[in-house]
Amino acid sequence: MITMKDIIKEGHPTLRKVAEPVPLPPSEEDKRILQSLLDYVKMSQDPELAAKYGLRPGIGLAAPQINVSKRMIAVHVTDENGTLYSYALFNPKIVSHSVQQCYLTTGEGCLSVDRDVPGYVLRYARITVTGTTLDGEEVTLRLKGLPAIVFQHEIDHLNGIMFYDRINPADPFQVPDGAIPIGR
């Protein structure tokens, strides 16, 4: 079981590496790691379990955040309509995206960052992601809004990118024309 002590913090070199692809079919160890990422995000959203194990709530987690430099992510988030997006993916990849951008009005946070970083993180408003599930199924996901933001945040971790790298240092709250605000 992953707990907060397993999550590495900003400044750790693994968070700046490009993670390695997972050979498919995945090993039992890689399956166990990916399942543990999903278990963490699910458990962290349960107030009772989060309190019991001292888990900081999260809606996504990438393997590099537990010092495993492999291309694996887990996301457990609902959109504005209450639809649940719960996925654990090997080798996720953004295969297409909109020109239009969006941003979280609250800014973004990260389990590997223990400080508030003010500013808007501009993301693609719509993306298509491919990846392989724990069951070995190839999936194609068309995402928008908060789920699209979370997938982009987690896939950034696989490429050594932190969310605050995407904040404009000259004007952290700059909003380009046509960017869609996403509330949380």
Swiss-Prot record:
Known cofactor(s): Fe(2+)
Keyword Membrane part of the UniProt annotation: no
Residues reported in the UniProt entry to bind Fe cation: C110, H153, H157
Key word DNA damage present: no
Alphabetic keyword roster: Hydrolase, Iron, Metal-binding, Protein biosynthesis
Annotated active site: E154
Recorded catalytic activity of this chain's protein: N-terminal N-formyl-L-methionyl-[peptide] + H2O = N-terminal L-methionyl-[peptide] + formate
Tree of life domain: Bacteria
InterPro entries from the UniProt entry: Peptide_deformylase (IPR023635), Peptide_deformylase_sf (IPR036821)
Catalytic EC class: hydrolase
GO terms for biological process, alphabetical: co-translational protein modification; translation
GO molecular function, one term: metal ion binding
Record EC number: 3.5.1.88
UniProt remark on cofactor binding: Binds 1 Fe(2+) ion.
Family to which the UniProt record says this protein belongs: Belongs to the polypeptide deformylase family.
Its biological purpose: Removes the formyl group from the N-terminal Met of newly synthesized proteins. Requires at least a dipeptide for an efficient rate of reaction. N-terminal L-methionine is a prerequisite for activity but the enzyme has broad specificity at other positions.
Protein name as annotated: Peptide deformylase 2
Species this chain originates from: Geobacillus stearothermophilus
Lineage per the UniProt record: Bacteria, Bacillati, Bacillota, Bacilli, Bacillales
